[in-house]
Amino acid sequence: MKLCVLTIASLLVTVTSLETQKEIAEGSELTREETPSLVEHKEDEAAAASEKRSCIEEWKTCEHSCECCGSSTICSSTWAEGKEIKLCKNEGGTFKKVLHFIQKGISKLKSCKEGN
């Protein structure tokens, strides 16, 4: 639910020009101090960028496969450093993250056994 609200809010911020935002703020008699959601939005964008960077670093080892993802993740393809890589984003709580870690470990063990 929070993710949906943030997505909708980010779309509105992107679509709405800065001038329109000022008019809305003036019309509602709001000041920057009274609109902390703008600061939160910037912090969320920074956190998402950081998460994506760590995801790219993690998936350099699984460049052409999403098998390491497990069922608790969404897999998508992207380009980084001239290579197509797979990105996986965890969807779930601590339990699913533990399962993801175990699945990833098993997958790496299998690939090591197949290599030897």
Swiss-Prot record:
Segments passing through the bilayer: none
UniProt keywords, alphabetically: Disulfide bond, Ion channel impairing toxin, Knottin, Secreted, Signal, Toxin
Molecular function GO terms recorded: ion channel regulator activity; toxin activity
Cysteines engaged in disulfide bonds, as pairs: 55-69, 62-75, 66-112, 68-88
Propeptide residues, chain positions: 18-53
Residue ranges of the region described as Disordered: 24-46
Tissue: Expressed by the venom gland.
Compartments, as annotated in UniProt: Secreted
GO CC list: extracellular region
Signal peptide: 1-17
Annotated family: Belongs to the neurotoxin 03 (Tx2) family. 02 subfamily. HNTX-XV sub-subfamily.
Biological role: Probable ion channel inhibitor.
Free-text comment on this protein's domains from its UniProt entry: The presence of a 'disulfide through disulfide knot' structurally defines this protein as a knottin.
Protein name from the UniProt record: U30-theraphotoxin-Cg1a
Taxonomic lineage from the root: Eukaryota, Metazoa, Ecdysozoa, Arthropoda, Chelicerata
